[in-house]
Amino acid sequence: MANITLGGTPTRTIGSLPEIGSIAPKFIGLKSDLSPFDSNELDGKNIIINIFASIDTSICAESTRKFNEKVSTLDNTVVVCVSMDLPFALERICGGENLKNIIPVSVFRSSFGNDYGVTISDGAFEGLLSRSVVVINSNGSVIYTEQVPEIGQEPNYDAAIGSL
């Protein structure tokens, strides 16, 4: 369980992020165009999973934009932006802003939050996902994690990118 804050108010997640060196849990969801997503389709690639509560918050949208920009020059690397948002919300921001270097994925019907330990267990955002980042290498191993301590803060983009 991670202790985090939302606007300074303490809250918790149901578990912990996957351990460094472990094989990343596979997951499914829906892409913003309503097609199915299966993380197996990314086998052999470096994956940055940008996890957040809702694309409709300014920090979540900004993290999506920044990761889109930062990975544009990286080979064999993809950013998967994961939230409990409906695919329509993800399409409105990601499609509307032509963010081509990311894959927006809604996990509103999957066990992702439990499998990655990022479901918020209490407070105003209960049931949503905590802001965090997981980086997976091309062999499927977790090489970097960050549980952002305050939901209103941005993740450490440079540390995530630098872990590759």
Where would I find each of the regions flagged by the language model?
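Chalcogenol-based redox active-site neighborhoods
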Residues: 1-164
